[in-house]
Amino acid sequence: KRVVYKHVVKDKEAAVHTSEIVLQTLKKGNAAYVKSGAFAGDISPEKRLALTAGQSPRAVVITCADSRVIPEVIFSCGLGELFTIRIAGNVIDAHQLGSIEYAVSHLKTPLVVILGHTGCGAVQAALHGEADGHIRYIVDTIREAIGEEKDPREACHLNVLCAGKEIRAAFSAEEDPLLREEQVACAVYDIETGKVEWLDEDD
């Protein structure tokens, strides 16, 4: 069964409420994917044509560039439903923040999700060794986030939570914040089971 995203954001107070609704829809979308093992998003020619008039994505998803992690599949979303930002290790810098700001301020996207995943090579590199070339910038960022943690799963969690804190610090600390703290959610995708674990519920 296809998950339909219907909610439109009108103002900041509505955005907080809408973000909660969208989050629940993402959870249902992931449950549908885990159950069916199939892609249920709308990628029809009709949807593609409708989107030529503009986009109104329901969530920003910052995730790893890993080929096994496809947000639209994981959350049963189709064209135009997710504003996806991908970078190895799902790390945050000024470029990612700029993309988030564009989605939230210009496209009125109500929810930001940081999605890490199990078996992340960038996290493994931060745990076990030095990185050469440009990769070291990513690894150094993750190493700073995970500190002395040695467990791969816990390190993945810490990396995601650190990214969430950076986003909240960038957009939620002002008197008139672009994002409320409740509009930022942290999660980890299990590449074996297909399930998404939502960290903010327990931390």
What residue spans do the PLM features occupy?
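Short helix-loop-beta junction
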Residues: 76-84
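Active-site-flanking structural segment that lines cofactor/substrate pockets
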Residues: 55, 59-63, 67-73
